[in-house]
Design a protein with these regions (language model features):
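Catalytic core of pol beta-like nucleotidyltransferases
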Residues: 1-28, 35-40, 51-109
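Short beta-strand->loop micro-motif that forms the acidic, two-metal-ion catalytic signature
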Residues: 44-49
Length: 109
């Protein structure tokens, strides 16, 4: 994938996030696409931190699914993982959080 295409997809994710996620949310690209060591078939990992008490199935429909659909426009797989900010803040010692903190790129919020 060219740098221009990569940047186009990053900007598309950022744009979609600005349309769909609520005020107070944070959107972070993480994984191989954020680190710059992705293969051609690598997916796009996106973390969405929501400022609410719990994640519901409606949140998945409202925030994860539109990003998955966006990926189809580019023949790419975009996987969004949802956390509440409270749950994220309480997972300080998790390897997942450490990886996102080290490699993640904030796209929105």
């Amino acid at each position: 994938m060219t740098t221009a295409t990569h940047n186009q997809i990053v900007n598309a994710i950022r744009g979609k996030a600005s349309q769909i996620v609520p005020k107070g949310a944070t959107v972070i690209l993480f994984g191989s696409r954020a680190r710059g060591d992705a293969r051609e078939d690598s997916d796009w990992d996106v973390l969405i931190l929501l400022d609410k008490d719990r994640i519901t199935s409606q949140d998945i429909d409202d925030y994860s699914y539109p990003l998955r659909e966006l990926g189809w426009d580019y023949n790419q797989c975009i996987n969004a993982i949802l956390y509440t900010k409270r749950d994220w803040d309480s997972s300080i010692s998790s390897p997942f959080r450490e990886n996102v903190t080290e490699d993640g790129i904030r796209l929105w919020g």
